[in-house]
Amino acid sequence: EFTDIERLVADTHSERDYLIEQVVEKMRSELENRSIDAEIVGRPKHFFGIWKKMKKQQKTFEELYDVLAIRVIIDSNMDKNYCELNADPDTQKCYEVMGLVHALFKPIPGRFKDYIAMPKPNNYQSLHTAVVGPKGKPVEIQIRTRRMHHVAEYGIAAHWAYKEAGDSVVA
């Protein structure tokens, strides 16, 4: 079964890359039109992650919503020292971008999670949604600020060390 998933993921890799690129380009164009500075990264999920999720959720490959995943990281035009842990100046932009995503692509009901208003216990913050992408394929989209991304990737302790060191630390 694992090798079947591996083969299915490998067989659909180029199509998934193409679909992700279509969504990324459409979003990039709209964000530029609205002068929102953001990094948009798309990635097809690795087969082992897909297999684990299928097992855990008892779903088929086609039923998963995050086989195609895109992350939008909003960059601040504000001074980085201004960004305090609970005072991220770009938080509102996350919701603006979410509205834009839902205007560009049909949202999938029940697939929106607001971890900004309700952070996870480890202080993870992000907006998650799933939308109907090209060819009717579901696409998971995560939206967060650069500060939220840093906390998500490196943890809250690393975020504070980064803030204390200023811009001299590259993370």
Task: Give residue spans per PLM region.
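Nucleic-acid processing machinery
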Residues: E1-A171
